[in-house]
Amino acid sequence: MNKLDPLRLCDQAPLLVFAHANGYPPQAYRTFLTPFLDDYQVFSLYLRSFWPGTDPQEMRDWRAFRDDYLPEVHSLIEKYGKRTESSGSVIGVGHSLGAMTTLMAAIKDPGLFRLLVLMEPVLFPRWQGTAMRLLAPFKLIKRIHPLIQGTLKRKTWFESREAMYQRYRVKPVFSGLSDQVLRDYVEGLAVEDAEGGVSLRYTPAWEARIYETGGIADWYIWRNLDKVECPVLVIRGEDTYVLFDRVINSMVGKLPAGEGYTMAGTGHLVPLEKPLKTAEVVRGFIRKYLN
């Protein structure tokens, strides 16, 4: 596997590590992450679904992302940070798949983090996660998941970045994104090819596999939330179709120091739809515990 180095955005302290959503490159979050650059060392990791030469079918469940994430973060600490065993040294921030990756990392290595911010973690109710785990060996999720077939049919080649941008600009899923955020998304996703056009850096096969394996490891999270002792802010979008009220309430209830926040006027793409407002909320949470 050809691992990609984290996108380094700043060289201040302390260390803030961000993990992206399924299909959304680190560059898409520039507007959201920019307000943090004066106060923190900001690194945005590329999850393995962006790494060249990786096979989606080798991933059984999302704990694979956790197992990639932890060595990366420890490497960043050795190079740029200073670990204090009693309080941790990293501010972990993630969106969607990235939030789940960050949370699972905190469960496995609870002393690593000062605090966590989880935006729209894709954590299902227990019954749904159990159902997906039982269906997985029979490969039935691929047939019934509402997003997988459309993902596999996605257009993967464009004449130019501008052509990609114009096609995406009219899609409902991106209607809440500003022009600048969408252009940052395209810039991070597009890669020039030998034909003179651009193709997707993030393959539909990987995106679909992530959908297919979602929920399989949820039991691991529900069983171990009480191990995450650092402060945790869980943010959901007011109009989300992913993170239900009862799920966030259960999460916050099981986390020793959990808080919930609902971002008005947003769906699942909270930090992309309202990046500056979301950054303001996150910065306020960090300041409450670090200052």
Task: Please describe what each predicted stretch is.
Residues M1-R8:
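A short loop-to-beta-strand scaffold at the N-terminal edge of the catalytic core in hydrolase folds
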Residues R8-E58, E72:
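Conserved HGGG/HGGXW glycine-rich cap/lid loop of the alpha/beta-hydrolase fold
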Residues F43, L47-V93, L134-L135, E280:
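Active-site loop/oxyanion-hole signature of alpha/beta-hydrolase fold enzymes
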Residues Y46-W51, V122, T266-G267:
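Short beta-to-alpha linker loops that shape the active-site pocket of alpha/beta-hydrolase fold enzymes
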Residues S89-A131:
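Conserved hydrolase catalytic core segment
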Residues L152-R209:
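Conserved alpha/beta-hydrolase catalytic His-Asp/Glu region
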Residues A190-G253, T262:
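Conserved serine/cysteine hydrolase catalytic core
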Residues T266-P275:
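Catalytic histidine-centered segment of alpha/beta-hydrolase-like enzymes
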